[in-house]
């Protein structure tokens, strides 16, 4: 058992979750973590035209405001995602808004896109030393009437420094945001953002990949609609998935009634089923990043086998500690050695059918 699981987690869990998160950011900014990474050509891959040193990324939500971009790569991650960032700064929803469900190794959040806004985050990113792939997760302000315009503004603002964009229309904590996943709205959104990218490509001379991040609570018909719009668009990939509104199977009855999106271990099955279904619907060429419930090498590898090209995690480091990316990569290399596999890409899609045939959880 790691030092974090023995002592560090106990100490941090004595604190309010937001306070603990702030302390983690301060620690990383102070350089308390040593520089470590796992370098092995078998972990390298190219996705959406981008070259990744490894397939394990830190999901949006941890470093919302680009405060510790360099330090995240010191933890072994192959890429990181900043945000969600909105055009104007906003404080988010009232506190308390972040809850640990320890029995379930889960988190409920209703943060509400609290962030410093485009201008400040852009300035911080410009000052960073680039150590790997950095994506920008863009969103809309809570009080915005034209939410699509907020996303287009995000693409224009960060275009010259983003390695990729994530269009976050699946957070359950901004009123009306998930409505953008409905087919007619999604069609308008994707067309507008494709046009925004074309304008920026003409200006800058290069194209930045765009990923769409979806909820795990969509019906089979809604997944079909997303797949069809993805095929019609020039978006580069999908991120599956955001947090869930479901509370199915939770043991922590005290906190399970809190409003917000649920992440962590209980999300693994639901998000992996959706991932595999979307891989079947989209075919082999469109990139997919798998997120939800990854806590070790086994769950990371299962996402790849279910159809993911890359994975992201966040809740996992809350419960397993900051060494999680390094641990996953080392153990994956052991699996590859045992299986005689030369590249992580070999595992992709091995269990798509197994996961895709399962019914979507209620």
Swiss-Prot record:
The active site is at residue 171. CDD domains: DHOD_2_like (cd04738). Its EC number is 1.3.5.2. Monomer. Signal peptide: none annotated. FMN binds at residues 60-64, 84, 137, 168, 213, 241, 264, 293, 314-315. This is Dihydroorotate dehydrogenase (quinone). Its cofactor is FMN. Binds 1 FMN per subunit. It holds the Pfam family DHO_dh. It catalyses: (S)-dihydroorotate + a quinone = orotate + a quinol. InterPro entries: Aldolase_TIM (IPR013785), DHO_dehydrogenase (IPR050074), Dihydroorotate_DH_2 (IPR005719), Dihydroorotate_DH_cat (IPR005720), Dihydroorotate_DH_CS (IPR001295). Keywords: Cell membrane, Flavoprotein, FMN, Membrane, Oxidoreductase, Pyrimidine biosynthesis. Catalyzes the conversion of dihydroorotate to orotate with quinone as electron acceptor. GO terms for molecular function: dihydroorotate dehydrogenase (quinone) activity.
């Amino acid at each position: 058992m790691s030092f974090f699981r023995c002592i560090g987690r106990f100490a941090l869990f004595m604190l309010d979750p937001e306070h603990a998160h702030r302390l983690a950011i301060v620690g990383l900014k102070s350089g308390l973590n040593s520089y470590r990474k796992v370098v092995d050509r078998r972990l390298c891959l190219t996705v959406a035209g981008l070259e990744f040193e490894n397939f394990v990324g830190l999901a949006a939500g941890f470093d919302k405001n680009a405060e510790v971009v360099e330090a995240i790569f010191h933890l072994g991650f192959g890429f990181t995602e900043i945000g969600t960032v909105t055009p104007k700064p906003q404080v988010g929803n009232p506190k308390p808004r972040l809850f640990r469900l320890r029995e379930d190794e889960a988190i409920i959040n209703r943060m509400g896109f609290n962030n410093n806004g485009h201008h400040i985050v852009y300035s911080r990113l410009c000052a960073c030393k680039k150590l790997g792939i950095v994506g920008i997760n863009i969103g809309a302000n809570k009080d915005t009437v034209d939410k699509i315009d907020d996303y287009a503004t995000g693409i224009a603002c960060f275009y010259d420094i983003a390695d990729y964009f994530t269009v976050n229309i699946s957070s359950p904590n901004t009123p009306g945001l998930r409505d953008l996943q409905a087919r007619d709205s999604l069609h308008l959104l994707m067309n507008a953002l494709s046009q925004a990218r074309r304008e920026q490509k003409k200006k800058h001379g290069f194209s930045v990949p765009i990923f769409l991040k979806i909820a795990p609570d969509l019906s089979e018909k809604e997944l079909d609609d997303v797949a069809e719009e993805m095929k019609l668009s020039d978006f580069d990939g999908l991120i599956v998935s955001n947090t869930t509104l479901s509370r199915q199977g939770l043991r922590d009855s005290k906190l399970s009634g809190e409003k917000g999106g649920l992440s962590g271990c209980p999300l693994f099955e639901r998000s992996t089923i959706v991932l595999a279904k979307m891989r079947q619907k989209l075919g082999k060429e469109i990139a997919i990043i798998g997120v939800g419930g990854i806590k070790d090498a086994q769950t990371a590898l299962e996402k790849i086998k279910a159809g993911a090209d890359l994975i992201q995690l966040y809740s996992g480091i809350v419960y397993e500690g900051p060494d999680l990316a390094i641990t996953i990569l080392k153990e994956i290399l052991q699996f590859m050695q045992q299986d005689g596999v030369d590249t992580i890409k070999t595992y992709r899609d091995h269990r798509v059918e197994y996961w895709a045939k399962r019914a979507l959880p209620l």
